[in-house]
């Protein structure tokens, strides 16, 4: 049986998921990168044969069951971290987005993480000090126009994190949410005004570092933390939304969103 710590990553073939996989692999963890992008998985496996890979459609519950059973067969049934990373974005106003794309964003970004939590629960519960990490976004702090379904889906991630943190408290599973602004991945190739005003400065390595930090709390106070910013601008946005009067926060968001 493998005695190293383990992490299962959805959407692990490219972008942030791939970077998280490499970060934890380099630290000696048993890493599972699962994705619907089989070509990306083949490339990852070719470059890093020790990373466990497999197909995962996050909108299909049976796919989750099969992928987790496959991965945990390498870990003795243990799972230290579930990284709910898979997500997609569509740009343009709601009236101009294809209905299928709108539905797909909700299915992957919302249903996907919920299925992941349900399927992984028994493995996380069976592992002392386990974590579930979900990939949120600063666009889940205040609604962002032109990427509205995506932004709304990240509000779901935020609320899901809060609720699951309470629901799983009895099982001693810690639940956290990573909330970056725009990251240098294909996901940022959208026509949102906020990408132009704020720029795309965060690297995938920065997000991977935040994921690592989130599952390694150093003290009691850090263990109470749920939301993790990645850069100063997204921290400022989160604090402004939390502590500013609603009209001020709205005006600030209007400036960002254009």
Kindly give the residue locations of the regions a language model identified.
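Active-site helix of classical SDR
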Residues: 117, 153
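Substrate-binding pocket helix/loop in short-chain dehydrogenase/reductase
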Residues: 93-106
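C-terminal helical subdomain
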Residues: 177, 195-235
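Conserved NAD(P)H cofactor-binding loop of Rossmann-fold oxidoreductase domains
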Residues: 85-90
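Residue(s) in the substrate-gating loop at a strand-loop-helix junction
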Residues: 137
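The beta1-alpha1 cofactor-binding region of Rossmann-like NAD(H)/NADP(H)-dependent oxidoreductases
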Residues: 56-66, 99
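Canonical Rossmann dinucleotide-binding motif of NAD(H)/NADP(H)-dependent dehydrogenases/reductases
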Residues: 1-32
